[in-house]
A protein has these predicted regions:
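N-terminal, charged amphipathic alpha-helical interaction modules
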Residues: 36-66
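Short, hydrophobic beta-strand segments
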Residues: 6-13, 49-54, 90-99
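Short, Lys/Arg-enriched N-terminal segments with co-localized hydrophobic residues
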Residues: 1-4
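Positively charged, low-complexity, intrinsically disordered RNA-binding extensions
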Residues: 44, 94-98, 105-164
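Short beta-strand elements
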Residues: 37-43, 77-84, 122-124
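Short amphipathic alpha-helix segments
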Residues: 18-35, 67-68, 104-116
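Helix-adjacent hinge/juxtasegments
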Residues: 59-100
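Helix N-cap motif at beta-to-alpha junctions
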Residues: 55-60, 102, 137-140
C-alpha cells in the first residue's frame, strides 16, 4: 500500500496588485491634503520598492503613516516593508522602502530546524525561497502550522498549496 503524503508550502509573498492599489490610494490622499499642496510629494512604485519623494524630510515622515495605513487597509502586512534611510539633498528628500518577498536561507534553516525539533512525523524541505512540509496526517501538518504561527518571525508567512 502506497500512502500519498500530505503537504503544504510556506511562502512569503506580496499581492503586487494590492500594493499598487495602496500606493495609488496614498497618492490620492496626498493630493487632497492642503499641507502637501505644491510640495511635489509623491509615492512611486516599482517591482521591488516604493519610493517616497518630497521637498523636506519632515514631509517624508508625514507620508509614511499615510502609506502604511493604505497598505494595511488592503491587507498588506507591514512586516514586508524594509524602509531605508531618508536621503536629503539640496531641496529634496527621498526614502526607498524595499518590498521583501521570499524566505531567505537563514530563516528557512530556522524553520526546518523547528520542524525537526518538534518530533512530529513531518519533514521540511527548502525549495528556493519557500519551504515544503510533508507528513502522513493532516493534523500533524496543522500542528506544524500552529507551531510556526506561534513563533514571531520578522516577515509575514503564508501557508499555501495544502494537499492531502
Amino acid at each position: 500500500e502506497v500512502r500519498i503524503m500530505a503537504s503544504f508550502d510556506i511562502k512569503s509573498e506580496l499581492d503586487h496588485h494590492e500594493v499598487t492599489n495602496a500606493v495609488d490610494q496614498a497618492n490620492r490622499i496626498l493630493q487632497n491634503r492642503f499641507d502637501f499642496k505644491g510640495t511635489g510629494a509623491v509615492f512611486s512604485i516599482s517591482e521591488k520598492q516604493i519610493d517616497l519623494s518630497a521637498n523636506e524630510e519632515f514631509q517624508i515622515h508625514q507620508m509614511s503613516p499615510l502609506l502604511n495605513e493604505s497598505l494595511a487597509k488592503r491587507g498588506i502586512d507591514l512586516k514586508s516593508l524594509k524602509p531605508g534611510e531618508i536621503q536629503v539633498s539640496g531641496g529634496s528628500a527621498q526614502q526607498t522602502i524595499d518590498l521583501q518577498e521570499g524566505i531567505d536561507k537563514e530563516l528557512a534553516k530556522k524553520i526546518t530546524a523547528l520542524v525537526k525539533q518538534s518530533k512530529s512525523k513531518t519533514q521540511a524541505s527548502i525549495q528556493g525561497d519557500s519551504i515544503r512540509i510533508t507528513g502522513k496526517k493532516r493534523d500533524e501538518l496543522q500542528a506544524i502550522i500552529q507551531l510556526i504561527k506561534d513563533q514571531s518571525y520578522d516577515i509575514p508567512l503564508q501557508f499555501v498549496n495544502f494537499r492531502d
